[in-house]
C-alpha cells in the first residue's frame, strides 16, 4: 500500500526541481532555434555597425537614462473580482455594458501563482516571487526555501541609484511590502520586519518612502500615553517612530498633517518619509472615514510627487521604483464580503488611473505593471440558491445597498450586545432596524436569520460570517473558501515609450510564472539580484523568542487572521 506525505516548507513541489534557483528557460523548439539564430546574427551585425558608428546607436544596458517603475499588487484579486467590480460599477453609475475599468484596457497576460511547497500560495511566497524572482515556501518573507535571505528588486534598485517606495492599505509590515524590504523566516515576525524597513540590517536604509497602516509595530506594547496611538505591539520596548525621526525620517501619522502633503502633491515631503495612518490596517473603503484616513489614490499622489521631485533634484538619480498594493481586496475575499471587495477593487482602479495619467504626462521612461499574488475566496459571480434549476443571474444592487463591511458591523453589534446584555428585545430590534435594514439594506430577512444572529450573542467572527453570507446569498455571489485558490491571475501593463512597450509585451504578454514578473522588473531596471543576495547573507532573519514565545506569536497571528477568515 502506497503512503503519501504532505509536503513541508522544504519539500520541492515538483520532484527534480530546485525552487531556490532562478527558473530555467523554457524548452526551445527547432523553429525557435532558427529564429534565435537569426536574431543573434542580426544582433552581431548591429554591434558591428555600432562600432563603426558609435554615435548612431545606444545599447539598452549602457543608456543610463532615467526610468520609473510603478509595480502594483492587487492582493487576492482574481479575474472574477474584476468582473464583479466592473458590473457593479456599470450598475450603480448607470453605465453602458461596454464601459470597462481602467485596468481592463491594459490587460496583457496572466500569471501562475504556486509557491515552492504548495499549489496554493500565500501572500508572502507570492510577493517573494515578485521581489526575489524565485519560488519560496508559504510564509517566507524575502528568503529562499532554505531560509536564506534573497536580494530583492527594491534593494537592488536602491543600490543602483533609484529612489524607492512602498504604499499599501494594510500594515506596512504585512507580507507584500515586507517581502520587498526585509528578510525573515515567517511573515508573523512583523516587529523584526519593521526594523529592517528602517535600515537595521546589512544594507542599511534602502526604502525612501513607506506609507500605509501598521503603526502598532513601530512603538512599544502597553504605551497608553504614546503620542502615536494606544495599541503598540512591540515587545522589545523600542519606539521605532522616535528612532526614525532621530535618524532623519519625516514622520506623519494623522490626516491633518497628511493633507498638507496632499495639497502640494507631495512636493513638501522630505525623504526618507514614514507615513503610518492606522495602528493596524486602514479600514475598508466602504467603512473608511475620509476625514481620518487617506485613500490609496491620495497616498499614491503624495508618493509620486515626492519621488518625482527628489529624483529631478538629484542629478545622480536613475529614477524610482514604487510598489503600490491594493491590500484589502484580499481581506474582503477572506471574509467572503462582496460589498467590501467591489469597493476595494474600484478604489484600486482609481489609483491605477491616477498613476497612468502621471506616466502619460511624464518625459521619463515609465512602466506600470499590475498583477495579483493570488486569488482569495474562490469567488464566482453566480450562485445556486435553490434546489431547482439555477437562475443565470446575480444582483449588483444588493451590494450597492450595503453601506458597511461585515468587519465593521460585527464590532458594532458586539458593542451593542455588551452594552445591553440581557435586553433581548432591544438587541433584536437593533439587529433588525440598525444592522440589517439601515446598514445592509436587507428587508427580507427571515426568522431563521434573526434567530441565528441573536444566538450568536457576542461571537464576533460568526456574526461577521453570517452577515456577509446574507449579502452574498441575496446577490447570488458564490465563494468556495475563506482562504486562497490556485487560479491564474491577470497581468496588466503600460509603458509611455513605444520601444519600451514592445519590450514589456515581449516579456509579459501571455501566461507566465509569477517569478517571471520579478525577472522582468530585474531586467528592465538592469539590476543584479544575485549580487544583492551576496551582500545580505548575514541578515538576522530568525526570531529571538524561545519555542514557547514563538508558539504564542503564531497563535496571536493566527487569531488575527481568524478575524479575517471567519
UniProtKB/Swiss-Prot annotation:
Which top-level group of life is the source organism from? Eukaryota
Which positions does UniProt annotate with glycan attachment? 268, 401
Q: Name one GO molecular function term.
A: metal ion binding
- Chain positions recorded as Zn(2+) 1 binding sites: 330, 334, 484
Q: Which residues lie on this side of the membrane: Cytoplasmic?
A: 1-33
Q: PTM Phosphoserine: list the residues.
A: 123
What is annotated as the active site? 123
Cellular-component GO terms for this entry: fungal-type vacuole membrane
What keywords were assigned to this record? Answer: Cytoplasm, Glycoprotein, Hydrolase, Magnesium, Membrane, Metal-binding, Phosphoprotein, Transmembrane, Transmembrane helix, Vacuole, Zinc
Spans through the membrane: 34-59
| Residues that coordinate or bind Mg(2+) | 75, 174, 176, 325
Q: State how the cofactor is bound.
A: Binds 1 Mg(2+) ion. Binds 2 Zn(2+) ions.
**InterPro entries per the record?**
Alkaline_phosphatase (IPR001952), Alkaline_phosphatase_AS (IPR018299), Alkaline_phosphatase_core_sf (IPR017850)
Q: Per the UniProt record, which EC number(s) apply here? A: 3.1.3.1, 3.1.3.54, 3.1.7.6
Where is there biased composition of kind Polar residues?
1-11
Quickly give the catalysed reaction.
Answer: a phosphate monoester + H2O = an alcohol + phosphate; (2E,6E)-farnesyl diphosphate + H2O = (2E,6E)-farnesol + diphosphate; beta-D-fructose 2,6-bisphosphate + H2O = beta-D-fructose 2-phosphate + phosphate
Family annotation (Gene3D superfamilies): 1.10.60.40, Alkaline Phosphatase, subunit A
Q: What top-tier enzyme class does this entry carry? A: hydrolase
SMART domains for this protein: alkPPc
Q: Which GO terms describe its biological process?
A: nicotinamide nucleotide metabolic process; nucleotide catabolic process
Taken from the record, one Pfam family name reads Alk_phosphatase
Q: What does this protein do?
A: Phosphatase with broad substrate specificity. A truncated (soluble) version of the protein is responsible for the production of (E,E)-farnesol from (E,E)-farnesyl diphosphate. Acts as a fructose-2,6-bisphosphate 6-phosphatase.
Q: What else is known?
A: Present with 3060 molecules/cell in log phase SD medium.
What family does the Swiss-Prot or TrEMBL record give for this protein?
Answer: Belongs to the alkaline phosphatase family.
Record-given protein name: Repressible alkaline phosphatase
Per the UniProt record, the source organism is: Saccharomyces cerevisiae (strain ATCC 204508 / S288c)
Source organism lineage?
Eukaryota, Fungi, Dikarya, Ascomycota, Saccharomycotina
